[in-house]
Each structure stands twice: as C-alpha cells, then as structure tokens.
Amino acid sequence: MEIRCNLCPRHCNALRTDTEGLGFCRSPLIPQVNLIAPHFGEEPVISGTHGSGTVFFEGCSLGCIFCQNHKISCGLSGNAIPMKAEVLADRYLELEDSGVHNINLVTFMHYAPEVARSIEITRALGLKIPVVANISGYEEVSTLKMLDGLIDIYLTDMKFYSQAVSSELAHAPDYFMKTCLATDEMVRQTGDPVLDGQSMLKKGTIVRHLMLPGYLFDTKHILDYLVSRYGDKIYISLMNQYTPPAELMDKLPQRLTRTVPAGHYRQLTDYLMELGQTNAFIQESDASGNEFLPQFR
C-alpha cells in the first residue's frame, strides 16, 4: 500500500509505503514499535500502582529540538519492530493480562489509520481497560476524528504559545493554532473527566505543559488559555521535569542547556492555583533527571 500523506499539520503530501516514509516523520505506514512495557512515570491517575501499559512508537510529526525521546522520535532507530493492527491488538491484550491500568499509545498519530484499526480489533477481542492517546497536541482534527469512539483518555501536550518559540524549538509556527483546534476535538470526544473507584481516570483529557527554562511567559499564556477555555473540564499537568539531553547539548539554545529553576516553577504553580484550577497535577521539586526515561532499544 502507498499514500500521499497529509495526516499531520505539516501536510507533507509525501509518499509513504508499508516499508518507507519520505515525509517529516520519516515513517512508513506500518507502525514501528520500539518498546512495550508497563510505565510508572505518568500522572497518578494514569500510572496508578500497577503502571500504564505503554507502547512507544518510533518517529514523530513535531520534532522538538529538545525531545527526551529523541533516540526514537528523530526518524527510525533501526531497532523497531513493524507491527500491523492484528499484532498490536494482541500486544494490548497481553498488557491487560499483566495487570496494567490502561493501554498507553505514545506518539502514534503518524500511524493513526493502522492504530485505529488495532483498537477496533482489540475491543472486539475483549479489551476492557481504557485506551490512552499520549500525543504531542500538534494534530489535524480530521485525523483525530478517525479515533472518535476508540480513545478513552487523551494525554496531550500544549507546548508552545508564541509563534516565535514554536518556530525556534519545533519549526512549527502554527503550533498553537493547530493545538487549540485539536484540543477542542479531544475534549469533545472524551467529555468531562471520569474517575473509577480507585481514583484512576476512565475517561477525559489531560493537557500537559512542560515548563522550559527561559520561557516563563509562554507558560503563563498557556495556563491562561487552558483555564479560561476549559477550566475543570480537563486536567492540567504542569511539569518541571525538563532535562537537557546530553546528546543534544551542542544543538540547543543556551537557555535550554539547564533545568527550570525551582523558584520559577513555584511561581507558575501558584499562578495556576490563583486562576482557580482544581483539576491539576504538579510535580515535586526534584522531578528533572533521567530516572523515569524508558530504556529504548
């Protein structure tokens, strides 16, 4: 099979086949999976006590220059396993049998048609736990609509507010506009957050924002927008875990070669509370570091 791909906002119109991809994500049509394992580094309502059943896909349509998963996001590593929908569906069931709280699909939207089919198959085979779409936020609404009724939880990002910042750090000047439209669609699909008896999220949308050193005003604008637009119809997760990847240090702007100062993070968590947001997650002061990073192949 081959297509001219326009799944993401970059609209490459690039040729993609089952084995080759010439677009920005550099990915073929068949999903390339690097790692499948329980993961304990997500928000408490996702990871719980048994972990989130995480499937890490290779490639990415955003390509932030500071990505902590750059080993698998900047093109293909050479270590991925191609998995069609039927194989993925079986892997989800194996994860469910291991006792995880949910199936957590990480950075898969460039494979959306095949992943959507995998969810349909696994549901038909009896999967009962929630399916989480763990994505960058830089999505096309038309592609998200392929997942309508299949995704229980969106775990998404709102990374940048300023056009100048998103251009500098992800070569995506339209990031904020596209992400606002995409987030509206995610919230429409999931509705308000719903917790089960163990305080695990069954349905809803979590919007993450990773604070970056030197970009406080971007963070403030994003919090203003999210609270005014959605309030407690979503969870806001304000993160301070940014750790400059050692392998990328020579390519990063100077301000991104350090972590977020603790005082800056406290300032913004206080601001989020002042805005009146109740559904929120904040991190401990020592959240930066590599201990929660997956061990990719």
Where are these regions (language model features)?
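Hydrophobic faces of well-ordered beta-strands that scaffold small-molecule active sites
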Residues: 53, 103, 131-133, 154-156, ...
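Conserved glycine-rich "GG(E/T)P / GGGxP" loop and the immediately following alpha-helix
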Residues: 96-121, 168, 174, 184, ...
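Conserved radical SAM core fold
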Residues: 73, 112, 137-140, 158-176, ...
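Non-cysteine beta-strand/loop elements that form the S-adenosyl-L-methionine
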Residues: 148-165, 233-241
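Conserved Radical SAM active-site core
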Residues: 26-153, 162-163
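Anionic-ligand binding region
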Residues: 167-197
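Auxiliary Fe-S-binding modules of radical SAM enzymes
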Residues: 1-21, 191-297
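Short glycine-enriched, charge-decorated loop/helix-capping segments at active-site entrances
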Residues: 71-81, 168-173, 251-259
